[in-house]
Amino acid sequence: MMFSSIEQSPQRYARIGGVLYLAIIVLGIFGEAFVRGTLVVSGDATATANAIAASESLWRVGIAGDLLMHVLDLPMILLLYILLRPVSETLALLATFFNLIQTAVLAANKLNLLAPLLLLENVGGLDAFSPEQLHALSYLCLLYTSDAADE
């Protein structure tokens, strides 16, 4: 039943998907351009650490936005499956499988953004490191997360 209604009118699903994609794009631009773009100083671990420490709440909001972006990927993946299933159920399942893996990997990778907060708080056990070493370690975690790690 649902199958035939999708074949007749996929516009509703496509519009919902479009709204989800717009939200994903806005959240991605916010996290990348506004948060990391203003707080991460390319090539300068100490300046980056100082900027994150000074704007910790902005950094946390950026992480939350990034994770929300990946949560919104889940209904988008379901919508893509629903829209593509009438064309080829096998390919729709394959696309769903790969999209779910991509989302899981990206969401797990975004957790690296929490590491600078932990390193800069200097929680127990980090006393052996100098502040410069902690700044370098936190910057390294950011490079693991970033697509711009080709510096």
Each language-model region and where it sits:
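Interfacial segments of alpha-helical transmembrane regions
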Residues: V87-T103
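Interfacial helix-start motif at the membrane-water boundary
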Residues: A53-H70
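Transmembrane alpha-helix/helix-exit interface in multi-pass inner-membrane proteins
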Residues: A33, L100-L126
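Short, Lys/Arg-rich, polar N-terminal cytosolic tail immediately upstream
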Residues: M1-P10
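Conserved small/polar residues in nucleotide/adenosyl-binding loops
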Residues: Y144-A149
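Alpha-helical transmembrane segments of multi-pass membrane proteins
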Residues: A23-S42
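Perimembrane loop-to-helix junctions flanking transmembrane segments
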Residues: S42-S57
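Membrane-interface interhelical connector segments
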Residues: A115-L143
